[in-house]
């Protein structure tokens, strides 16, 4: 069996199979008996393949599970974060298998064992997290414990609820108070589980003037409670946060506890900051949670334990009500939910538990201290000494801001400044978060959208550090990546307005304001048949933009270009990505306009040529038919009779008629094929008009990519050479215009020798000057053209 397990590529599955085999060997008192089949059973076609025959061995089944987990080899690898399962993780996984085995014991042994496991785990959690004189309820879904607590509160406040049911609630409606910063969907979940209507929920807003904007407004909550009491409602339960789901801020739990005691409201606390109760130093706001009526803990996430249930600790003296509410159960299977946590806590010990929580807090503090030294990064910090969650975002520094602007609470910033910052930086922060997630996946970053602060990046090591194995070096790498992305972010933000002005000042281009695009901007080319009022798709415009995208990508610039429909309509647009500081926006916009115009003209030229060819063919058919009729009139009817016509043609041969017509694509005209048959050479036809030359492209240095500004003051090009280069270009332009004027005079019989001498002298002068400009390839090419 051990040799077979070594064939499995996934070490986690192999280790788990080995642990399960070892546990079964130790726990079983007698060797397992194998059942012999009495005869070969007939194979039914309705039975799936894996179930046919005598079954599969464990190695084959584990290999099948491994293939299902990692997918086929042909599929592209997905960038999914796989949790790092350590020894403590194997203990948690082993607990589920042991739970299934323990459930086969006799009832008395099972009762004693499950009672011991449940009581030990409850006592350990109460001592670790400073919650005295409480009971524990273990549940798989995090919100399930709160739903049971709400049911317990209903039974406690409504004594006749067991007899009269919801009629009691109808006469005096219960009210459950939730913070506006609570996790999404929590209120709807509670109403669905309890069978209560949505008006029983009361959403308490957060602070707007003083304190954190993610903390519950206590004064407003008290006003809501008084209003509900006056209306004949019953304030039932309040859910407070010790670490909100978004930014990890803690409510004023001490003040909320006093308010709940005054009105007889059940206080329930949840949040990631409850993990810090295991540390030696705890902030006063979090420490106040130990006096609440109930709290929900998630030790599996904090300690990196897979498939470990959440725990709800509560205080209540009536066992009958807790049994009715579902918080306690006589079923052994319900008590065995604590077995994985019971094994894992013993394996880690108190020092291991505290060390893991302390490590996560140190990671967050390390990131906070490093981000303070980074410009253009704002940190949403509640308590710098104890906050285990770091939320930050990129922002454009205001002119009147000082060095302490980044560390102050967001509520102290002017609302107008926050609005401008959010409007211009949300897309860039979303791009920054996605880039950091790819570059440093060990940090477990998430991108969040906050109602007040906009798009931010969250680092919560308490929820991810143990599973991903986050270290201090990963935080340092994260800071390095942030610093490397800041120049691109600041330059892109600065170039946005310049790009908008250039596009609005260029004929044929329309600036598209897309707030969700993080690049320089979005532009659309308006062709001749473009309808601005229509929001439907434009096939002609899509064709032009597709060709434009291909041309722009062929330039091999540092910019990224994408095509997609405008977010307000179905029309195609060109999306320009992030940029650095040396991007020439004017050249970029001019190139887009000229290239799109050329594509449109070429498309129309092809359409016109198709129409000309079609009309030419029709005209040729008409002329040939007319020529055939004239030939019949000249030859007469007798020549058309087979025998008679041959005799007449022998006595009086007819002259050869025209052979046909040819269509000159260059000239766009019909021509006779007589010249071709006589001279055996196809005629040149009419000389086509000269093709107009496009606009002269910007002169670039060797190796310089498109849309790059000239490097002034560099070693490659000095200021003197730049000035002389510009002067030489002007002389070449003057020379070309002078040559055109002299050529016109040369055709007149008045002064032909003088014009020729002038041209020769100017050419010779420029040729001598070009010998000192060996690196100026553009001048050499111009001189060769003039020569």
UniProtKB/Swiss-Prot annotation:
Residues recorded as bearing Phosphothreonine in the entry: 687, 691
One Gene Ontology term from the biological process aspect of the record: carboxylic acid metabolic process
InterPro entries: GrpII_AminoAcid_Decarb (IPR050477), PDXDC1-like_2nd (IPR055103), PDXDC1-like_3rd (IPR055102), PyrdxlP-dep_de-COase (IPR002129), PyrdxlP-dep_Trfase (IPR015424), PyrdxlP-dep_Trfase_major (IPR015421)
SUPFAM superfamilies: PLP-dependent transferases
GO molecular function: carboxy-lyase activity; pyridoxal phosphate binding
Pfam families reported for this sequence: PDXDC1-like_cen, PDXDC1-like_cen2, Pyridoxal_deC
Ranges of biased composition (kind: Basic and acidic residues): 26-44, 725-748, 772-787
E.C. code: 4.1.1.-
Modified residues (Phosphoserine): 652, 710, 718, 722, 748, 778
Keyword entries, A-Z: Decarboxylase, Lyase, Phosphoprotein, Pyridoxal phosphate
Bias-annotated ranges (Polar residues): 759-771
Annotated spans, Disordered: 26-52, 682-787
UniProt cofactor(s): pyridoxal 5'-phosphate
PANTHER family given in the database record: PTHR42735, PYRIDOXAL-DEPENDENT DECARBOXYLASE DOMAIN-CONTAINING PROTEIN 1-RELATED
Family of the protein in this entry: Belongs to the group II decarboxylase family.
Name under which the protein is recorded: Pyridoxal-dependent decarboxylase domain-containing protein 1
Organism: Mus musculus (Mouse)
Gene that this sequence comes from: Pdxdc1
């Amino acid at each position: 069996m051990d040799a077979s397990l070594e064939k499995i590529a996934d070490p986690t599955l192999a280790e788990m199979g080995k642990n399960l085999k070892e546990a079964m060997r130790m726990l079983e008192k007698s060797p397992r008996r194998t059942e012999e089949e009495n005869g070969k059973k007939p194979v039914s076609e309705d039975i799936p393949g894996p179930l046919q025959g005598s079954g599969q061995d464990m190695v084959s089944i584990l290999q099948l599970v491994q293939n299902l987990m990692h997918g086929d080899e042909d599929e592209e690898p997905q960038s999914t974060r796989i949790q790092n399962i350590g020894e403590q993780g194997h203990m948690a996984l082993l607990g589920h298998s042991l739970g299934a085995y323990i459930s086969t014991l006799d009832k008395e042994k099972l009762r004693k064992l499950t009672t011991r496991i449940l009581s030990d785990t409850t006592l350990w959690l109460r001592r670790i997290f400073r919650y005295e004189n409480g009971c524990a309820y273990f549940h798989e879904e995090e919100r399930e414990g709160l739903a049971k607590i709400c049911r317990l509160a209903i039974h406690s406040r409504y004594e006749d609820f067991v007899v009269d049911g919801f009629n009691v609630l109808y006469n005096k409606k219960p009210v459950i108070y939730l913070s506006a910063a609570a996790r999404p969907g929590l209120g709807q979940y509670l109403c669905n589980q309890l069978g209560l209507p949505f008006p029983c929920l009361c959403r308490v807003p957060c602070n707007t003037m003083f304190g954190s904007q993610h903390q519950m407004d206590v004064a407003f909550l008290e006003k809501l409670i008084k209003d509900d009491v006056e209306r004949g409602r019953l304030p039932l339960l309040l859910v407070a946060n010790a670490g909100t789901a978004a930014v990890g801020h803690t409510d004023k739990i001490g003040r909320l506890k006093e308010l709940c005691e005054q009105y007889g409201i059940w206080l329930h606390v949840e949040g990631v900051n409850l993990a810090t109760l295991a540390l030696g130093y705890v902030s006063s706001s979090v420490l106040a949670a130990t006096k609440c009526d109930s709290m929900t803990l998630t030790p599996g996430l904090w300690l990196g334990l897979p498939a470990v249930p959440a725990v709800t600790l509560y205080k209540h003296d009536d066992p009958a009500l807790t049994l009715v509410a579902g918080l306690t159960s006589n079923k052994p299977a319900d008590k065995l939910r604590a077995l994985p946590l019971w094994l894992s806590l013993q394996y880690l010990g108190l020092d291991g538990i505290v060390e893991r929580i302390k490590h996560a807090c140190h990671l967050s503090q390390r990131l906070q201290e490093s981000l303070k030294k980074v410009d253009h990064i704002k940190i949403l910090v509640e308590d710098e000494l104890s906050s285990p969650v770091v939320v930050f975002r990129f922002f454009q520094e205001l002119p009147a801001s000082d060095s302490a602007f980044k560390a102050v609470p967001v509520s102290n910033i002017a609302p107008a400044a926050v609005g401008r910052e959010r409007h211009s930086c949300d897309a860039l922060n979303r791009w920054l978060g996605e880039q950091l997630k790819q570059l440093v996946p060990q940090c477990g970053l998430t991108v969040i959208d906050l109602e007040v602060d906009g798009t931010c990046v969250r680092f919560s090591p308490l929820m991810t550090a143990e599973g991903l194995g986050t270290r201090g070096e990963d935080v340092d790498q994260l800071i390095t990546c942030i610093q490397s992305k800041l120049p691109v972010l600041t330059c892109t933000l600065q170039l946005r307005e310049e790009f908008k002005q250039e596009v609005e000042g260029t004929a044929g281009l329309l600036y598209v304001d897309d707030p969700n695009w993080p690049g320089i901007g979005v532009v659309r080319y308006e062709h001749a048949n473009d309808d601005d009022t229509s929001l439907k798709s434009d096939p002609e415009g899509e064709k032009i933009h597709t060709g434009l995208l291909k041309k722009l990508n062929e330039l091999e610039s540092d910019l990224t270009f994408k095509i997609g429909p405008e977010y307000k309509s179905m029309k195609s647009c060109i999306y320009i990505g992030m940029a650095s500081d040396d991007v020439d926006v004017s050249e970029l916009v001019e190139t887009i306009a000229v290239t799109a115009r050329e594509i449109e003209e070429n498309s129309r030229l092809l359409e016109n040529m198709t129409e000309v060819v079609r009309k030419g063919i029709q005209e040729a058919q008409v002329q040939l038919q007319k020529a055939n009729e004239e030939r019949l009139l000249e030859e007469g009817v007798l020549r058309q009779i087979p025998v008679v016509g041959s005799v007449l043609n022998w006595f009086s041969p007819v002259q050869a008629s025209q052979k046909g017509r040819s269509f000159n694509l260059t000239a766009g005209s019909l021509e006779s094929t007589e010249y071709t048959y006589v001279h055996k050479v196809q005629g040149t036809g009419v000389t086509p008009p000269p093709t107009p030359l496009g606009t002269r492209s910007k002169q670039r240095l060797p190796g310089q990519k498109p849309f790059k500004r000239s490097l002034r003051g560099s070693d490659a090009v000095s200021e003197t050479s730049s000035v002389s280069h510009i002067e030489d270009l002007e002389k070449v332009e003057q020379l070309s215009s002078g040559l055109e004027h002299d050529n016109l005079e040369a055709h007149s019989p008045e002064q032909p020798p003088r014009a020729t001498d002038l041209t020769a002298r100017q050419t010779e002068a420029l040729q001598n000057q070009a010998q000192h400009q060996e690196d100026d390839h553009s001048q050499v090419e111009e001189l060769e053209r003039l020569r």
